[in-house]
From Swiss-Prot:
Name of the protein described by the UniProt record: Ferredoxin-thioredoxin reductase, variable chain
Function according to Swiss-Prot or TrEMBL: Variable subunit of the ferredoxin-thioredoxin reductase (FTR), which catalyzes the two-electron reduction of thioredoxins by the electrons provided by reduced ferredoxin.
Residues covered by region (Interaction with ferredoxin): 43-46
Keyword terms: Oxidoreductase
GO BP annotations, alphabetical order: photosynthesis
Family as reported in the entry's similarity comment: Belongs to the ferredoxin thioredoxin reductase alpha subunit family.
Entry-linked Gene3D superfamilies: 2.30.30.50
Assembly and oligomerization: Heterodimer of subunit A (variable subunit) and subunit B (catalytic subunit). Heterodimeric FTR forms a complex with ferredoxin and thioredoxin.
Keyword Oxidoreductase: yes
Disulfide feature: none
GO MF term list: oxidoreductase activity
């Protein structure tokens, strides 16, 4: 997975910070977005992030995922 790849959320991930559903449970399963970052290092040092894939969706919304929670969309 690289920055700029289109991905789809394949597993049930519930968030509470979606802009249209503030403070209520919202399931991201089936949503599509773009990989904004893959977190492997911080300040030049390697890290082992629990949720390393940062995905940007529409409407100024981003969320972190495990690699097995998203799949690439082939164009």
């Amino acid at each position: 997975m690289n920055v700029g790849d289109r991905v789809r959320v394949t597993s049930s991930v519930v968030v509470y910070h979606h802009p249209e559903h503030k403070k209520t449970a919202f399931d991201l399963q089936g949503m599509e977005g773009e990989v904004a970052a893959v977190l492997t290092e911080w300040q030049g040092r390697p890290i082992s992030a629990n949720l390393p894939v940062l995905v940007k969706f529409e409407q100024r919304f981003k969320a972190h995922f495990r690699p097995d929670e998203v799949t690439l969309i082939e164009d």
